[in-house]
Amino acid sequence: MRQFTMSQKLYMGVKRIIDILLSAMALILLSWLFLILCIAIKIDSRGPILFKQKRVGIHKTHFMIYKFRTMRLDTPKDMPTHMLADPEQYITRVGKFLRKSSLDELPQIINILMGKMSIVGPRPALWNQYDLIEERDKYGANDVMPGLTGWAQINGRDELEIDVKAKLDGEYVKKFGFIMDLKCFFGTITAVLSHKGVVEGGTGEMHK
């Protein structure tokens, strides 16, 4: 288990307060966008608006993550997108826009309010993504709260190989603190606007 300094432990408490305040504010301010996206998803394809999936949380506990549904109902369950033979065939029309813009991740604000996720942290792995979970163990990256965005997300995202992604998650844990979270937060704005690192079926196209 990763050992944290006293200042890092204190920051974890502060970070939780920041998460609650910002996620509550985001839910209120973005309620109009949630409504529009819910209507678009319902009109576009058959199925529920939200997609739930078992993911790995802090200390490798499991929780259900929330996303806007972007794929058809016949998509193989609990399978990472990069393991699908042709992921494009399962993605809905609205889903393509949501995934490219990262708006499909917005319902995770609920996960943050519930205390299962943080705004910044390693992206939560699928419960059966054993290769990524094992690699993260080497760096203590399973010992922090998973995040809506993180260091690996702004440094390659889907283009990264599993081992490279885990190393970046480990780098985040090593430098865990307010400054690192600020870098990830503002780096995310640039990454989302440029669609940087979004590759359907990735991990990954970027060379190690």
Segment roles from a protein language model:
Residues Y11, K15, L84, E88-I91, ...:
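Short, structured helix-loop boundary elements
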Residues F51-Y90, L148-L168:
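Short, glycine-rich, amphipathic interfacial segments at transmembrane boundaries or analogous
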Residues I110-K208:
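Hydrophobic structural segments characteristic of membrane proteins
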